Amino acid sequence: FIKNDVQKATFLKKGYDGDNRKFNLSQDITCKLYRSFSKAQMKMSISQLEKFRACPFSHFIRYGLRPKTLETYDIEKRELGSFIHDGIEAFGRYVQENYATLESLSEEALRTFLQTVLEDGAKTRFEHHRLSSPRNQFFLKRSKENLYDLMLGIIEQMKASRFRQVGQEVHFGQRGSLPPIYLQLGEDVIALEGFIDRIDKATFGENSAVIVIDYKTGKKEIDLSKLLDGLDLQLMLYLMAASQNQDEAAGAFYLHLSDELLEVDFREKEKILQAFKKTLLFDGLVINKPEILKAIDVNYDEKNPTVLRFYGRKKDVIEKDNVLSTDKLTYLLDHAKHRAIENLEAMYQGDIKIYPYQTNKDNACTFCTYKAICAFEPNTSEAYRLVEPIDWASLDKMVG
């Protein structure tokens, strides 16, 4: 073929040998592209920093070029996740504003609230023509039923905890109820802003402690490798923001709000209920103080805790992998801020290279919307940015 049609062969060879490298943008273009660096704003979200760390080029498309996505008629899984997220937040506000004790909240009142808030929420979030689709109606109905079970599970958690909600969708930022986290960028200062899904607080004599809960509708679990790499900054920086008012930083957790069917290999109702409750356990990091552990989860040291999920083989809860000393938790908080500054500086220098991360579990390309744009080919001269697995024992050496 190469001998018979040199012109076509040359064309194909150029495509195969093409250079897909992306060089840094000038600082002038960077500041014009990213609104965060304009003198009028000088603020940024944590999710933007995480996106940059996952892949600079994907971040450049999302936040620099900002392409519009085509709307679809079918309600997508991502939208259903947001719908469930909104329902749980509305439920949290409803409980916080109307019930001093959860014992006075009846199942009838919960169902009435659920019916009203979800009907209003569906009308607000989805256009009328999408709500009329039988397919969409089915998935919305299933989500509503699932939300009721989620709320019952969360109520049981609240009853087993002395920590009480003090905020839903709490804004930390220049105009928020909490101040922003300030990051130094050369001679400038960037305000890191965001919204914390939920903050719970408890008092211990003259002192108080806070925990933050981040609602997740996808499969998200605590991962030390990603925490240290800077891929997962939210939990640590949310906790830093929430504890700025002299409250002790006691824990940061994901709360999974899955709309997926529960797969079990047994039929007993009680076992199915226990399996469902396990999906709702707080997944994150907590300080190793027994009085705080007991305040978060009265059953923390039992075989089946009500609120907290623990990692590691050691029998003593205090020695579990994700139960950390004050020094370790402080180290992770400081490290998250350090990583945020690193990401910010690289972004400011105009880094837009195609360099997606890869761990032993996943990579940045799996759910990336912009794969067709970058044409990343890991089998050629291009390569993933490898994130090595780090076990919890390594944290001891880092802290010293």
Report the location of each language-model feature.
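Structural signature of nuclease core domains in nucleic-acid processing machines
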Residues: F1-G400
